[in-house]
Amino acid sequence: MTAPSCAFPVQFRQPSVSGLSQITKSLYISNGVAANNKLMLSSNQITMVINVSVEVVNTLYEDIQYLQVPVADAPDSRLCDFFDPVADHIHSVEMKQGRTLLHCAAGVSRSAALCLAYLMKYHAMSLLDAHTWTKSCRPIIRPNSGFWEQLIHYEFQLFGKNTVHMVSSPMGMIPDIYEKEVRLMIPL
């Protein structure tokens, strides 16, 4: 991986799928239920909650800042409009020694896609490396195909090359990193 290891947590606990998943020392991903759990937020010292949904309403707690990113989990939603502003915001919180929780409804597609954009921009990770790392921390991530197309375009903007490509499959266009998985699911 191309990211400096000092920015990433030591993997001393199992990856989480229901609670908060720690991605870096200052960035976590979760679903909407976990994002409204005061004990979970305080025990992980969360200072900023970024809600990437239109359907989840946050309970507002003192000493925590909130940012709403109103995007539906649909392939035609323009999540890319938020790649830079959200990555910049996460970085700004980190520079102030804060911790950010990025969440959507399930913690699978929208929040994961914005996490990948942040890792590419601020940790100089390729899209493939960012996905591999994030999936190791939160195994259920799976941005929708439209978000993948936007991430692939963003990776090219940042680095002038791509490490993930969209390919045709019986399920439609998918990122090539899912190709083997789809082949196992659909017998030819």
Swiss-Prot record:
InterPro entries, per database record: Atypical_DUSP_subfamB, Dual-sp_phosphatase_cat-dom, Prot-tyrosine_phosphatase-like, Tyr_Pase_AS, Tyr_Pase_dom, TYR_PHOSPHATASE_DUAL_dom
GO biological process: dephosphorylation; peptidyl-threonine dephosphorylation; peptidyl-tyrosine dephosphorylation
SUPFAM superfamilies in UniProt: (Phosphotyrosine protein) phosphatases II
Pfam family for this entry, one: DSPc
GO annotation, cellular component aspect: cytoplasm; mitochondrial inner membrane; nucleus
Annotated keywords: Cytoplasm, Hydrolase, Membrane, Mitochondrion, Mitochondrion inner membrane, Nucleus, Protein phosphatase
Primary location group: cytoplasm
Domain Tyrosine-protein phosphatase: start-end pairs: 19-160
Bilayer topology annotation: Peripheral membrane protein
Residues at the active site: C104 (phosphocysteine intermediate)
EC main group: hydrolase
Catalytic activity: O-phospho-L-tyrosyl-[protein] + H2O = L-tyrosyl-[protein] + phosphate; O-phospho-L-seryl-[protein] + H2O = L-seryl-[protein] + phosphate; O-phospho-L-threonyl-[protein] + H2O = L-threonyl-[protein] + phosphate
The enzyme's E.C. designation: 3.1.3.16, 3.1.3.48
GO molecular function, one term: protein tyrosine/serine/threonine phosphatase activity
Span list, region Sufficient for mitochondrial localization: 95-141
UniProt subcellular location: Cytoplasm; Nucleus; Mitochondrion inner membrane
Family indicated by similarity: Belongs to the protein-tyrosine phosphatase family. Non-receptor class dual specificity subfamily.
The protein's role, per its UniProt record: Can dephosphorylate single and diphosphorylated synthetic MAPK peptides, with preference for the phosphotyrosine and diphosphorylated forms over phosphothreonine. In vitro, dephosphorylates p-nitrophenyl phosphate (pNPP).
Protein name: Dual specificity protein phosphatase 18
Species of the source: Pongo abelii (Sumatran orangutan)
